[in-house]
């Protein structure tokens, strides 16, 4: 594995670690990168598989500007994810990451990347359908989003 020296990004540390560098440099994490618009049981199911194996999760929220497909700010999304996992006592760290789309992210700096393809029987959950269901005042979406964050999702979508 090659090592690349990089200057510390103080903005990242300030936003994600209160200005302090992380002390978890030797800890291995299962890393999940996404938009989470909103965070739903499909996301939770994948992450829970790693947590059940005793592997802590690092959930990285892509730092994107809100738009029709992304109605929640990065900060709102992070708070919802933190709220859910705090209610469960999960070993989860949530942080933002600059917007990326390449699955190759991290390979160039020597990280070991193990891609995970979810099993086909896990089902497909569409965040777009969840947002549309809320806009249409249809409660079908409630079976797809954990009760601990449902009120936040509705409030943020209806008060934007």
Go through the PLM ranges and name each one.
Residues 2-160:
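Nucleotidyltransferase catalytic core that binds NTPs
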């Amino acid at each position: 594995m090659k090592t690349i020296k990089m200057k510390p990004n103080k903005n990242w540390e300030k936003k994600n670690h209160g200005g302090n560098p992380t002390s978890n440099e030797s800890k291995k994490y299962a890393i999940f990168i996404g938009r989470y618009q909103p965070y739903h049981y499909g996301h939770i199911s994948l992450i829970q598989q790693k947590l059940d194996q005793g592997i802590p999760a690092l959930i990285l929220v892509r730092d994107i500007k809100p738009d029709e497909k992304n109605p929640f700010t990065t900060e709102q999304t992070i708070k919802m994810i933190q709220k859910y996992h705090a209610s469960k006592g999960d070993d989860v760290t949530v942080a933002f990451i600059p917007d990326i789309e390449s699955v190759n992210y991290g390979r160039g700096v020597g990280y070991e990347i193990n891609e995970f393809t979810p099993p086909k029987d896990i089902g497909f959950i569409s965040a777009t359908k969840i947002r549309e269901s809320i806009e249409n005042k249809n409660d079908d979406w409630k079976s797809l989003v954990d009760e601990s964050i449902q009120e936040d999702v509705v409030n943020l979508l209806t008060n934007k």
